[in-house]
Amino acid sequence: AFAIVLDKPPHLAVHPTLNYPLDTLANGYAARMEARGESPVFRPVNRIDKDTSGLVLAAKNGYAAPLLARNVEKLYYAVVEGELPLGKGVIDAPIGRQAESIIGRCVTPDGKPSRTEYTIIRAEHGLSLAACVPVTGRTHQIRVHFASIGHPLAGDDLYGGHRDRIARQALHCARQSFRVPTYTEVPGGIRLETPVEEHAHTVAVESPLPEDMRALLDAEI
């Protein structure tokens, strides 16, 4: 196997930090792989914030990691404040660091090109459910983009959302799909390649909406 998909709960950091040195997805992965007699090296293809829930794709070797990174497609569900028109939309706005902030990002003319495509599925009682495809992968992209149009994610107090109805940003990575790398034996090892689309075996993994986001929608929509 070249990859594994993990379903991360909210409030769990992906990597160890000064504030969260032990209880992380990376440490849990390493312990599980060691128990199975496999390499404990954690190679996440995508990363999600500590309070974001959902799928994290990890490569099981260093050869597969860049191939998977180039062809993975992700779908997120976000509950945003305010009622947006039903249907499809695009937020295409550059994102950069907030001045004098280590964590915060913002839409700024000198930021990196950033594009989020979304579909508003439901909108009622002051909330909207959006299915989001981050075409680019900037830090906090979905959070920053919706905040920039006046509709921050519910619970996202870093970008103007309110925590009276949910205790974290209402964002969940619900689906990932990727083409499985092919390999060819060569002298001294193997060569991994991303197959052309018409010959590819595509894997799609889905994660249901977590309980706190379901409760938010059930209560308000």
What are these regions (language model features)?
Residues N46-R47, V107-D110, R165-R168:
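Short Gly/Pro-enriched turn/cap motifs at secondary-structure boundaries
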Residues A99-I102, P113, D156-H162:
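Short Pro/Gly-enriched beta-strand edge/turn motifs at strand-loop
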Residues V80, E117-I120, L153:
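Conserved hydrophobic positions within beta-strands
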Residues A1-A99, A170, A200, E206-E220:
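RNA pseudouridine synthases
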Residues V135, R143-I221:
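Pseudouridine synthases involved in rRNA/tRNA modification
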Residues V90, A99-E100, P109-I121:
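Non-catalytic RNA-recognition surface used by pseudouridine synthases
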Residues H125-G126, A130-V133:
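Short histidine-centered loop motifs in beta-beta connectors
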